[in-house]
Amino acid sequence: MTRIAILGGGLSGRLTALQLAEQGYQIALFDKGCRRGEHAAAYVAAAMLAPAAEAVEATPEVVRLGRQSIPLWRGIRCRLNTHTMMQENGSLIVWHGQDKPLSSEFVRHLKRGGVADDEIVRWRADEIAEREPQLGRRFSDGIYLPTEGQLDGRQILSALADALDELNVPCHWEHECVPEDLQAQYDWLIDCRGYGAKTAWNASAEHGSTLRGIRGEVARVYTPEITLNRPVRLLHPRYPLYIAPKENHVFVIGATQIESESQAPASVRSGLELLSALYAVHPAFGEADILEIATGLRPTLNHHNPEIRYSRKRRLIEINGLFRHGFMISPAVTAAAVRLAVALFDGKDAPERDEESGLAYIRRQD
């Protein structure tokens, strides 16, 4: 039996472990953090499944992977025994009256990103009021993107950990290690450490991509005074933001994307900007309880696409570069990595790319 160690127990590591364990492989998972996943980038994320909205800035490959991943998430959730939220009510884009020109620009970017006309639906104020009663009087029109959805990321992380326990996968939480620590004990290693693998990833001299962290700041608030039925994005020239409603009146709010690898707490200024923009969406948010303002580093490659690399000599597969799109694209990316892994475990030649996802398999020379 091939012995496999997965380094990194964030979202990608847990999904990879689940898929291999379901196929009967002998897996062990190692992570520097605890079972809840607080050290993972996914723990901070809003977990929106928004390939249409992200087409405004994301690469075509990321958008394609995002579209592939939504049905994959449905299948994954069916295999989890722990409750998880998955909402497929689309998303709503709104703006204040003075910022209406931003909506035309947004639509142009959507179409340039390959979003079809029937995926871009204009809602008037009465249509917003019917579907989002607490927003209808505040916004005269909006854009509805019907193909989008969201998860509760923290529920997913917990449910995946439960599933690994049910499959008797040894999970070594609070056990930080690097590939060299485990190579003598295991036949193959799969590195899913994200930003934690920066030194190892960038040490591969023959490979062109470089890994860095991009900082994000996300607030969580609680208020029973507001009900939203789908994620809402506010277009704004200075403070664009998204609001992702979770169960039990919790809302995840984010906006910032900072070219910094600082892991310091959020600043007063960035917190004020985020919460002021939230208050402008609806003043009832002014009475919300602030549960946390968290920061995280998203593992980002210079081309902003994910990559799957492998080395037969080192018996190592590496998955990285999911950037801020972890929940949106991880099912497609990890499924592609698992297909590569199975081929390598069986001693077969690796194809140049994965047929289903289109992702390239990059062979390291070391």
Question: Positions of the model-derived regions?
Answer:
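Conserved Rossmann-like nucleotide-cofactor binding loop
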Residues: 12, 35, 196
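N-terminal Rossmann-like FAD-binding beta1-loop-alpha1 element of flavoenzymes
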Residues: 3-28
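C-terminal catalytic lobe of FAD-dependent flavoproteins
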Residues: 288-366
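Dinucleotide-binding Rossmann-like beta1-alpha1 core, especially the glycine-rich loop
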Residues: 46-127, 131
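Helical element adjacent to the flavin cofactor pocket in flavoenzyme catalytic cores
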Residues: 142-188, 192, 196-199
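Glycine-rich FAD pyrophosphate-binding loop
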Residues: 22-42
